[in-house]
From Swiss-Prot:
The modification Phosphotyrosine is found at residue 186. The keyword Membrane applies. The keyword RNA-binding does not apply. Residues 241-271, 288-329, 587-653 are annotated as: Disordered. Residues 243-252 have a biased composition (Polar residues). This is Brain-enriched guanylate kinase-associated protein. Interacts with DLG4 and DLGAP1 and forms a ternary complex. It comes from the Eukaryota. Transmembrane segments: none annotated.
Length: 653
């Protein structure tokens, strides 16, 4: 709405002047003339035109100055901006280069890390596979170790069983040889021609050994070619292998010629040839190829040093010999006790569970190992063999007056029947002293103790042949081991001279004195053999086996042939006997008997052939334990073994 013609214009002019004043106050360089009103400028221009022109000129100059100043400042800012932009561009390029370098480095690191990861993965897989392989090998080796341990255990059990069976078999054969020595010949000796050819060859080999020569024949033609039972027993006797390991450190070079047959006289004790020259002896290696049976070893095979013997072969040989002995002396025994009564045992020895059948395989192993022995090892073996078997005999029972009287009673009839001039030749044993016959003194006779006299009355000197045939029955361990020797009424007869020294002289010794107390003493043949038959649970002398020579019968036992074989009465002794046994065991100083320890079956069943000379050490009273200790049941008891030996004919000579 319009309110007047002049009023709106007047208001607009006032507003413009006010705006210009504000603009001037806000910017100092704005000229002051611009802020003046147009009316004021017109009034000044009308009043003084020259003054107005000068003010305008001043304002123009001031504006030019200000414009130049602003332009210069803008140029400077532009230069600064350009320089800053250039610097920033350079910095940006540098940062980009560094970024590229860092990126490349990171890329390489990442690639290396990936490669290392792949390598680590491959190595882990390889290690895992190797670990699995080694675990499988470990399990396989563990199974092999378990199997080898089981095999070793089985081998150890087998070795122990074979050792026990071998010891048992050796004692049985030694017992058979001892019974052959002590058996009754009924005035008829074995002739050399009656023996089997193989046994004759063995006898010849035994005679060719140094110190093993056969005795010279007597002057009577009836005994011209007879073979004494002692020589037969020596050939049939089984040796005690013993332990060779303790003597291997003391070797000597003097036995190097032994395998070649160059042994010198006196290099070892000569009596060993009497005992260790049998078919199963492990100590005569140079003659073993001649002693072996052709069924086990071929004629062309090379017998090595220290080759093992097959025990069943030697048993078969002994059976053949016993069969020949049975045919030769059949008239001396009843028909019920000949080999025909035991038809199942006429052939070779069957291999039982007790005597194992591993000897053939072990013989092959020994044959393979024999070629690896050197001369020094052979010398060590020979020297240890010489030292091992040079032991002293236990001759306590040989010095008993009752033993001498019993042996003399047996030897008296034969001494009267033989030629009076039985010559004494040079002894084939260089190490033994000469022993001439002496009439006085309790010197034991030549003949061994007669087992048949043990069953006769004390006054009888010898059984009649017919009575022996009628009353004969097999002896057992209980019959012989428990009964004392009978007191013979006959005086001791002088010893019979023989080329090799007396049999009793060499086997049982001559040591003893007048103070020997032999009352109730058990037979020396079965003494320690019976002692080994003790069970381990017997409470006798605090669980230890007592020397059987102290075990006496409780009463006066009848030794008639019809007497039955009862158990040993001294094993279940009365109170008085037990007290007497304790006195004999503990009070050694009050007893005239020498104190002896436990004797193994080897010492009494396999007597040594060395003479009991005065040079023997009297202080050596103890003997070692058996080489193979008895452990458990071997499947064959001692009495069964004796029965088997009886059935095989070892008592039929």
């Amino acid at each position: 709405m319009w309110t007047g013609g002049r009023r709106p214009g007047r208001l607009r002019r006032a507003a413009s002047a006010a705006d210009m004043e504000k603009l001037r106050l806000r910017s100092a360089w704005v000229p002051s003339c611009l802020g003046q009103s147009r009316n004021l400028q017109g009034r000044r221009a009308r009043s003084s035109p020259s003054l107005w022109d000068s003010s305008l000129q001043e304002q123009k100059g001031e504006l030019r100055k200000r414009l130049s100043y602003t332009t210069h400042r803008l140029e400077k800012l532009e230069n600064e901006f350009d320089s800053t932009r250039h610097f920033l561009e350079i910095e940006l390029r540098r940062a980009q280069e560094e970024l590229e370098k860092v990126t490349e480095k990171l890329r390489r690191i990442q690639s290396n890390y990936m490669a290392l990861q792949r390598i680590n993965q491959e190595l882990e897989d390889k290690l895992f596979r190797m670990g699995q392989h080694y675990e499988e090998e470990k399990r396989a080796l563990s199974h092999e170790i378990v199997a080898l341990n089981s095999h070793l255990l089985e081998a150890k059990v087998t070795i122990d069983k074979l050792s026990e069976d071998n010891e048992l078999y050796r004692k049985d054969c030694s017992l058979a040889a001892q019974l052959l020595q002590c058996s009754q010949a009924y005035g008829r000796g074995r002739k050399m021609a009656e023996l089997p050819a193989e046994f004759q060859e063995r006898m010849n080999l035994h005679a060719e050994k140094p110190g093993c020569s056969l005795p010279a024949p007597p002057r009577r033609p009836a005994y011209a070619d007879s073979v004494p039972p002692c020589v037969l027993a020596k050939v049939l006797e089984k040796p005690d292998p013993g332990s060779l390991s303790s003597h291997l450190s003391e070797a000597s070079a003097q036995d190097l010629g032994f395998p070649e047959g160059l042994e010198k006289p006196g290099s070892r004790p000569p009596y060993k040839g009497d005992i260790y020259c049998s078919d199963t002896a492990l100590y005569c290696p140079e003659a073993r190829h001649q002693d072996r049976r052709p069924s086990v070893e071929g004629p062309g095979s090379d017998v090595g040093f220290l080759q093992a013997q097959n025990s069943t072969d030697s048993t078969a040989e002994e059976e053949e010999e016993e069969e020949e002995d049975t045919e030769a002396g059949a008239a001396a025994y009843p028909a019920s006790y000949r080999h025909e009564a035991f038809g199942g045992y006429a052939a070779s020895l069957p291999t039982s569970s007790s005597y194992s059948s591993f000897s053939a395989a072990s013989e092959e192993k020994e044959h393979a190992q024999a070629s690896t022995l050197t001369a020094s090892q052979q010398a060590i073996y020979l020297n240890s063999r010489d030292e091992l078997f040079g032991r002293k005999p236990a001759a306590a029972y040989g010095s008993s007056p009752r033993y001498a009287a019993a042996a003399a009673a047996v030897a008296a009839p034969l001494e009267a029947a033989m030629a009076p001039g039985f010559p004494r030749t040079v002894s084939p044993f260089p190490g033994e002293p000469f022993r001439f016959p002496l009439s006085p003194g309790p010197q034991p006779a030549l003949m061994p103790p007669n087992l048949w006299n043990l069953r006769a009355k004390p006054g009888s000197a010898r059984l009649v042949a017919g009575a022996g045939r009628g009353q004969w029955r097999p002896l057992s361990v209980d019959d012989i081991g428990a009964y004392p020797f009978p007191a013979a009424a006959a005086a001791p007869a002088p010893s019979l001279a023989s080329p090799g020294g007396g049999f009793n002289d060499r086997y049982f010794g001559a040591r003893g004195g007048p103070g020997d107390n032999a009352e109730g003493r058990a037979s020396p043949l079965y003494a320690s053999y019976k002692a080994d038959s003790f069970s381990e649970g017997d409470d006798l002398s605090q669980g230890h086996l007592v020397e059987p020579r102290y075990l006496r019968a409780a009463g006066d036992l009848s030794l008639s042939p019809g007497h039955s074989a009862d158990p040993l009465p001294s094993y279940a002794a009365s109170e008085g006997d037990r007290e007497r046994l304790g006195v004999q065991l503990l009070g050694a100083s009050g007893s005239p008997e020498p104190e002896l320890s436990l004797r193994s079956s080897r010492d009494s069943l396999e007597p040594s052939s060395m003479e009991a000379s005065p040079e023997m050490h009297p202080g050596a009273r103890l003997s070692p334990q058996p080489a193979f200790p008895r452990a458990g049941s071997s499947g064959l008891s001692r009495k069964d073994s004796l029965t088997k030996a009886q059935l095989y004919g070892t008592l039929l000579n």
